[in-house]
Regions:
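Canonical tetratricopeptide repeat
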Residues: 77, 111, 145-146, 178
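Structural marker of alpha-solenoid helical repeat scaffolds
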Residues: 67, 101-102, 134-135, 166-169, ...
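Canonical positions in the second alpha-helix
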Residues: 63-64, 97-98, 131-132, 165-166, ...
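Terminal, low-structured helical/coil segments at or just beyond the last alpha-helical repeat
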Residues: 182-222
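TPR alpha-solenoid repeat register
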Residues: 74, 108, 142, 175-176, ...
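Register position in tetratricopeptide repeats
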Residues: 50-51, 84-85, 118-119, 152, ...
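Residue-level recognition of tetratricopeptide repeat
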Residues: 71, 105, 139, 172-173, ...
Length: 222
């Protein structure tokens, strides 16, 4: 992961982006350029993400990329913006660029899997997230995404095993949303809502990524 010489103040679970996953992954590291200008551009672009002004974010980030063409963080953020615009081909291009510069950069690696997930290519998404789990088996987000892939594929037996593997109590809302997804899939929305409500109470804004993932899947519990 690239060195982080200064802090960009963004919530750990901003995404989507995932966040449809993209912003969560994007916010886990800062660019190596420590200039005030670069920091200001990043913060302004993230504010555009919050306001759903993705074209504005892209304009800022593309200009910054022209000045910092080898920066995997900036390239990952550009990919995140294209993801939000559902331009998945462009998003893939920038995630690949990010990984060319930093092959182990978790945010970009995660977002590649998220592209498969958003396009309903659950077999490839599952393969990708499981490969990432080999390097980080206790990562709750990866556990959650792999579980959802199995659930969407109708493999309930394997999904149940994956759900049991999600840490409780954990550092993220993954366990709660995993339980909610399982309950919803089995027709018990009342129970599912209870899990989501509990997650909101405990984790606050850290639930944003998980809520967006449910929205992407058409799981409406709010």
């Amino acid at each position: 992961m690239p060195h982080n010489p200064f802090s960009v103040k963004t919530p750990t679970f901003l995404l989507s982006a995932f966040l449809a996953g993209a912003l969560l992954a994007a916010s886990q590291a800062a660019p190596p350029d420590n200039s005030r200008e670069a920091k200001a551009v990043i913060q302004a672009a993230l504010a555009d993400f919050d306001a759903k002004k993705y074209d504005d974010a892209l304009a800022k980030l593309r200009a910054l990329d022209a000045k910092m063409p080898d920066d995997p963080f900036v390239q990952n953020l550009i990919g995140a913006a294209y993801t939000k615009k559902k331009d998945y081909a462009a998003a893939q291009k920038y995630f690949d660029k990010s990984l060319e510069k930093s092959p182990d950069f978790f945010p970009a690696k995660f977002n590649v899997g998220e592209l498969f997930f958003l396009q309903r290519n659950y077999p490839e998404a599952l393969k990708h997230f499981r490969q990432m789990q080999q390097q980080d088996p206790q990562n709750e987000l990866l556990q959650f995404k792999a579980f959802l892939c199995l659930l969407q594929l109708g493999n309930k037996e394997e999904a149940a095993k994956a759900l049991k593997g999600i840490k409780y109590p954990g550092d993220t809302p993954a366990w709660y949303y995993g339980q909610a997804a399982w309950a919803s899939k089995n027709g018990d929305n009342k129970k599912a809502i209870g899990y989501v409500t509990g997650a909101h109470y405990i984790f606050g804004p850290k639930t944003a990524l998980f809520d967006e993932t449910f929205d992407d899947l058409g799981i409406n519990l709010r």
